[in-house]
Every structure is written in C-alpha cells, then in structure tokens.
C-alpha cells in the first residue's frame, strides 16, 4: 500500500443532483490527485453534460475497467451506456436507476479488490434502500461522532425496537470502530436517554444496557437527556454519542456539522463514506454547491484505511505478551452519571455509589 497511491472509488450519485458538480470541483484541485487515485463510477456523457452546464474545465480520463485507472488522473469508469436525461433539480426514476447502477458496479469491483475505499456522492435514500444489519450508522464531524441505535423507523415504533441487546451490540461496534478506524485507544461513549424525561425505558432498558457494556469492557456513560446533553455541549467530553433514533442524533449533528458532516457504516469490512447531505436538488445545476463535504468524505475514507493498517500491523506478527493490561478506573469515576439512582452525590452531602 505504501508503494502505490490509495485508490478511491467514487459513485456519481443522483444524476439530477449536485454529485458531478462536487466531484469535479473537488478534483479541480491538483493536490487531490497527489493524495489518491480516484475512479469515478458513472457516465462520461452525463459527466460531460454537467461539466458544460457548469462551465467547468476539469478534465477526466475515460476507462472501461478499474484496472485501467492511472495515477495523476481523474479516471471516469463507464458503468452504463444508456442515454440518461439530465433534468437539474428533478428527482426521477431514471436518475435513481443511474445512481443504483454506479453503486452496483462499484460493489462488484470492491469484492474483486480493485480499489481500496468507496465514497458515494449524494443520492436519494430510496434509491439505495437501507436494511437492518449488524452494522452501525455513524455521522462524524470535527466536534462529535454520533452512532444510531435504530434507523428508518416511525417514532411510535422506536421504544419497542430499543432493547438491551441492540444497545449492547451497537455499543460494541461503536467502540471497535473508534479504536480501529479512528485510533482512539480507550474510547468513552455517551448513551442518550430515549425520552425527554427519564422514565421506564431508561430504567429497564438503557441503564441495564450500559451496565452490560461496562462488563464487556466498553466505557459507557449515561443515560443523558438529549436536549441537555447537546445544549450543554457535553459531547466534548466523549469520543462518541449513541442516539436511540434518527432525529435524536441527526438534528443536533447537522447543526454542529454545518453541512460538512460525513456518514459511514461501522462494523463492516469495507470502508464506505458519503457526505451527510442529499442530492440538494434545490441548487443543482446552479454552480453554487460546496464540495467540502465530499472532500471530507474522501479524507475520512483514506484516514480510516491508514488507521486500520496501523491498528492491524501488530496483529500480523504479535510479540509474546509479558504483562497484563489494567483498566483505567479513574476515567469511569470521572464521567459516570447515574441520574436514575436515588443516592445523593457528594455535592448534595451524600456518598456517591462507586461506578
């Protein structure tokens, strides 16, 4: 890996959105080609249409297979030959299909090991249906990393879906990703409460899940009321935040990320990132889209790959272990919060229960 540039596959996203605009803008900077070798999975005809409509001059080299990608060039791999009608700002079945074809071809090449990491330009969520699995949806920006315990559920169905087992599973995935993908040696997780006020779910589900995570070696704290947690900027004290459902994590995250957030799936072998915004149909074709979120998605994918290589290196030829690790109990005492316990804290004149 060190002898060659990292190959970054980038799917073109919704052809009626800002995908090509942010891709062309990002690689109009020559330093990007020094960082990696990009392979755009899309359509030369659609790319040329966008480039002309936006009066851009970014050059790309057309290839038919990923093996032909060359360093120092913006390689554009033809994923389909059909004509695609481009209507800026108009979501359509045709643009959805074009997005799906690019993703499908990229996934095929990923299985063959033809590139290193995958970045997806914005597309409608319906064009790439999500499914419940053993992964964790994460959103990352400079200030906070948020993991979602449940996704794509009506709010009325969330309480039943939030279980001790699910919180523990997602918490373990979160911890593993923070260690391997972000190189945080001893990550601390804040777990949000489900309700605006602590109630049944917090006492019977979330608190027991936190205790189980602790038993399994995960530093987990909470439950915290979401409004208080974000309003008081408590996220600065933690390496990750576990939200119980979409809006609980997405709404404050988007405010903090300011359109520069990145979304990824933790707990899977592949590295796949995407800007944390949609196709932005309202500004498509106007030349005003900001490419920084796509840049951040590319940077993060590359960093994750490097972090994994660094993390995995000692595991290839491990040295004999001559000592035993000791947990840092002091960290637990510092951040432990048990709002559902009835015992008073030292500040209230009582004794704090040991964490």
Predicted regions and their residues:
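Anion-binding alpha/beta catalytic cores of soluble intermediary-metabolism enzymes, centered on
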Residues: 1-355
